[in-house]
Design a protein with these regions (language model features):
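Active-site region of the double-stranded beta-helix
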Residues: 2-31, 44-217, 225-275
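Long, charge-rich, low-complexity alpha-helical segments
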Residues: 2-8, 13-15, 20-23, 28, ...
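Glycine-rich, charged/polar anion/phosphate-binding loops
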Residues: 223-227, 348-349
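C-terminal amphipathic alpha-helical segment
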Residues: 256-332
């Protein structure tokens, strides 16, 4: 969790995470995060999720937004429907053949297929904003899918996910059955299909939770928890917010990446070695174990090297998350009228590493580096705090310099006009 929740974000002056849980954020972090499910009833939460998704919004996405695969898939009884059965060309001027075909989806849906709309954090404006706030709250990359299930249909058989999930019930009722993990904290390369038999056996045992979600309810599922869901009565819609949490394994993976700098470890094994003979390979395994142990011991006393490992995690996070979108036309208009009274703010969710050289300060972004004179350092630190400020308030810069710097950072997508 972020150390400071911004109470002004999210509807109803609650943080994005706060809207999804019936306990306070610290209790969630200490007692539930990655440990056990949390069921939060609508009566325990302050508001519905109608601002995020509705049945009308689903129809709009299907019929009027030109959504293409892989942003959608359909399934029935655990089997995926070939995309050719629910996509088609959009006709003259839009000949791409993988666009959603609303009539074909109607037919498949009426036949009992569940529709999954994927990547809604990149498609649907309310969810773009909400997920950006949630990433700030929870500190891990997040994404959103929507599951639209026909009456009394089960979209997918019992399975587990390799990411944490928040389930938000939008409309209709859906029965959820949960069982404890057969593999705790699975990594992304450890899917449930690798343990299909164990999952099926666990799924016939007495459930940890058997409940019906109604509109406005929310359910948190740590990764690895086995679950299945069945629509009851009318069509049901729920959102799943998937959270791809960074783990200690990620730290270890980046730590071991340091070992590639060791020339001896990069040496080839002997020519003629029989790699199928474990006894022949074992001495080299033992030697590498000793070498790695020695290098790790050296890392304990090398704070700069450990810091570089931490920075690698930050770069990975920046690479797989996205800051708030910018409005190109609005920004250009704002830049043209920029003066010392204009208010700017750091672009939400934008990660920048700071370095200095040759009287310059460098902002390392995901896809480029922005360099400015060293006298901008205090102003950059001020802006990185995330608080809006007027151009005239930029620390250490005179009026003309402040305007030049603000305009440059707006153009580079580092700053945005303050609301």
């Amino acid at each position: 969790l972020s150390q400071t929740a911004d109470d002004q974000r999210g509807s109803g002056n609650r943080s994005a995470l706060g809207r999804l849980i019936s306990v306070d954020e610290r209790t969630f972090a200490d007692d539930y995060w990655g440990r056990k499910p949390l069921l939060s009833r609508a009566s325990e939460l302050q508001e519905s999720f109608d601002d995020l998704m509705t049945p009308a919004a689903v129809d709009e996405l299907i019929s009027h937004r030109g959504v293409r695969t892989p942003f959608a898939r359909m399934a029935k009884d655990g089997s995926l429907l070939d995309k050719s059965q629910f996509t088609a060309s959009g006709g003259f001027g839009a000949e791409m053949t993988d666009q959603l075909d609303s009539a074909a989806i109607l037919s498949a849906f009426a036949d009992g297929h569940t529709l999954v709309l994927q990547g809604l954090h990149r498609l649907w404006p309310p969810l773009i904003d909400f997920v950006r706030d949630l990433v700030d709250d929870i500190g891990h990359p997040s994404q959103v899918n929507s599951y639209i299930t026909p009456a009394s249909s089960k979209g997918f058989s019992p399975h587990y996910d390799v990411h944490d999930v928040f389930v938000l019930q939008i409309s209709g009722e859906k029965r959820w059955i949960l069982h404890p993990p057969v593999h705790t904290h699975p990594l992304s390369n450890q899917p449930w299909s690798d343990r299909k038999n164990a999952v099926e056996e666990r799924a016939i045992e007495a459930p940890h939770l058997d409940t019906v979600l109604q509109p406005g309810d929310a359910l948190y599922l740590p990764r690895g928890w086995i679950h299945s869901a069945e629509a009851l009565g009318d069509t049901t819609i729920h959102l799943t917010i998937g959270v791809s949490s960074f783990t200690r394994y990620d730290v270890a993976h980046n730590l071991l990446g340091v070992l590639q700098e060791d020339a001896e470890l990069r040496e080839p094994l002997p020519a003629g070695i029989d790699l199928t003979d474990a006894d022949a390979v074992l001495p080299y395994v033992d030697r590498v174990v000793d070498d790695v142990a020695n290098l790790l011991q050296q890392l304990k006393n090398d704070e700069p090297a450990r810091r570089r490992i931490a920075e690698r995690l930050g770069r990975r996070f920046a690479d797989i998350t996205r800051p708030e979108p910018v409005g190109p036309l609005r920004t250009v208009s704002f830049m043209n009228a920029l003066d010392e009274d204009s208010a700017v703010v750091w672009r939400q969710g934008l990660t920048a590493s700071i370095s200095r050289s040759e009287n310059k300060i460098h902002l390392g972004l995901r896809d480029k580096t922005v360099s400015l004179p060293d006298e901008c350092a205090d102003a950059i630190a001020q802006l990185q705090s995330g608080k809006p400020c007027r151009v005239s308030e930029l620390v250490g810069l005179d009026s003309n310099s402040a305007i030049v710097v603000a305009r440059r950072l707006l153009r580079e997508g580092v700053l945005v006009p303050a609301p």
